[in-house]
A protein has these predicted regions:
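Functional surface patches built around histidine and acidic residues
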Residues: 6-378
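Sec-dependent N-terminal signal peptides
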Residues: 1-5
Length: 378
């Protein structure tokens, strides 16, 4: 990319979502090659979101939100959740300084052996930019069509790259409802089938039961009898106010913002409002602080899984669930949870009647959010 930094064309959706898909050849740019070698294995579907980041940097725009990155990923057929992006720009880019900055960014990654990356670079108006988009590939997906027809049955086959005790598959359908489909798991591979029961967009999510608790490992989009969109629909926005909190907002105020967003989502879906429980707030708060301190998004950040943490607090529940998120703002954290089939299912689950909420802002100004759900809490 050189010359004028024009907005990129809308992404052209590939025919299937799958992984791994290796890069064809090596980057021509020496700095791109060095960054890719430092980051990890190249994944073809991550090149597109990296190019999008470069385009934004050259046009003086902020880094894309997580939902925008995921949209470009899915259009490119790349199925791994929780992608993160890094970029550098300037009149000239020192290889040594750029690699050092990348190393600092990568140092937050607790699972470097699972990391896959895409790299892109460009120049416009005398400014150079380079970007890396990385994911942790906890699983790989056999080819899944991105387009289908109503009534068609599709097979999901995900091969795990980490130890897991099992897994689930959740489908978010065109009407906004979620459903969990039965899946067969042989210790390494999870398989299931589902039907495109109506026209529209379907979001598929595979969640593995890892040593750190449930974790989304595969996400894909399928469109039945409709064309895929050219742009993300509100960045996965739920029915809430996306305004960022004012500078200096304390954690309690941020948790109240999250509570309002959750209440709005449930009200719009016709579900009763949850009762905020201070005991669950304390459990959520302790876990949010733990994740922020370790910079690790997980259901078990060394403090036990959600059920263990409830028991440690002297609490029992007929059913419980937990959502965790890490984002720049509370609104973006809520939007990311809303766009995730399994997390939305927790948010709208009818038999949950109580919730604990916590948001912790770290020293970088980023937020770590926890929603702890329960029914018949004692």
């Amino acid at each position: 990319m050189d010359g004028h930094a024009a907005p990129p064309d809308p992404p052209a959706w590939v025919e299937v979502t799958s992984s791994p898909v290796s890069l064809t050849g090596t980057p021509d740019d020496a700095l791109e090659r060095a960054l890719l070698a430092r980051c990890g294995a190249g994944e073809a579907g991550l090149s597109a979101p990296a190019r999008d980041v470069v385009s934004r940097k050259l046009r003086g725009l902020p880094m894309p939100e997580a939902g925008s990155i995921a949209f470009v990923q899915r259009a490119a057929g790349e199925p791994h959740p929780w992608a993160r992006a890094w970029a550098a720009s300037g009149k000239s880019l020192s290889a040594e300084a750029t690699l050092r900055a990348l190393d600092t960014w990568l140092s937050d990654d607790p699972t470097p052996a699972l990391r896959r990356c895409g790299v892109a670079s460009g120049a416009a108006y005398g400014t150079h930019a380079i970007a890396v988009v990385a994911v942790d590939a906890f699983a790989d997906l056999a080819p899944l069509p991105t387009r289908g027809r109503t009534g068609q049955w599709l097979t999901i086959e995900a091969k795990l790259r980490v130890h897991a005790d099992g897994g689930t598959v959740t489908i978010l359908g065109p009407g906004g409802s979620t459903r969990r489909v039965p899946a067969w798991f042989d210790g390494t591979t999870l398989r299931t089938r589902f039907v495109l029961d109506r026209p529209g967009a379907f979001a598929v999510q595979v969640v593995a039961s890892t040593s750190e608790g449930p974790r989304p490992v595969i996400e894909a989009s399928v469109f039945a009898d409709v064309e895929p969109p050219a742009h993300p629909a509100g960045d996965g926005e739920a029915p809430d106010d996306r305004r960022a909190p004012a500078a200096g907002s304390d954690d309690a105020a941020l948790a109240t913002t999250l509570a309002s967003a959750l209440a709005s989502a449930r009200s719009t879906a016709g579900e009763p409002e949850l009762v905020r429980d201070t005991r669950l707030d304390a459990v959520a708060r302790a876990h949010a602080e733990r994740m922020a301190a370790r910079r690790e998004l997980a259901h078990d950040a060394g403090d036990g899984d959600p059920d263990e943490r409830l028991r440690a607090a002297g609490l029992t529940a007929r059913a419980s669930g937990e959502n965790v998120a890490h984002a720049a703002t509370v609104a973006l954290a809520h939007s990311a949870l809303w766009a995730s089939p399994s997390h939305r299912a927790n948010m709208l689950r009818r038999d949950f009647d109580r919730v604990g909420l916590a948001v912790v802002r770290d020293d970088r100004g980023e937020v770590w959010a926890v929603e702890t759900f329960a029914s018949r809490l004692q």
